[in-house]
């Protein structure tokens, strides 16, 4: 058995590969605060008083000049740190650079390097980072930068990574 995914498939596939059951995944999806996860907000309990006052003033604030504007204009509206934190929490025990073939179910996920347009297949590395890179939808989430690469959602290059599954030895592909 192998699991290969891109975008949301990399998240579900990566978590399933390390042992989460379909019931656990379903429960996780239902209990998440998606408004928080799909934002760059900091939990109120972790904010300073001035941050609380500022966050309660506007529903949405986007800078129109400066470094932060350039980052958002060239990347995505959402940095994705809250999602990255969730992925990190869910993959405890798999934070070191690891061989994804040695997971309980061998796993690979796909991303695209926008610097050169090449498909990047993660067979190893930090699982949560690979998952985050594979779902970095351009314009929505900032790309993930690794070793000079600027990585975005794998679905931009290979939405159905059947070729990757075949390359690692899968015979029956669902």
Regions found by a protein language model. Name each.
Residues 12:
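Acidic, glycine-enriched active-site microenvironments
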């Amino acid at each position: 058995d192998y699991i290969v995914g891109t975008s949301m498939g990399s998240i579900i596939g990566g978590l399933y590969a390390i042992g989460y059951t379909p019931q656990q995944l379903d429960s996780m999806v239902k209990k998440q605060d998606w408004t928080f996860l799909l934002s760059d907000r900091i939990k109120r309990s972790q904010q300073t008083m001035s941050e609380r006052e500022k966050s309660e003033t506007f529903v949405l604030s986007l800078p129109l000049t400066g470094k932060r504007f350039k980052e958002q204009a060239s990347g995505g509206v959402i940095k994705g740190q809250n999602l990255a934190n969730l992925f990190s929490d869910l993959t405890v025990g798999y934070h070191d650079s690891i061989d994804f073939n040695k997971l309980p179910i061998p796993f690979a996920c796909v991303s695209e390097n926008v610097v050169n347009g090449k498909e990047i297949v993660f067979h190893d590395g930090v699982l949560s980072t690979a998952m985050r890179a594979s779902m970095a939808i351009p314009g929505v989430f900032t790309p993930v930068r690794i070793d000079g690469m600027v990585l975005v959602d794998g679905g931009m290059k290979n939405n159905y990574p059947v070729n990757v599954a075949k390359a690692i030895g899968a015979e029956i592909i669902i």
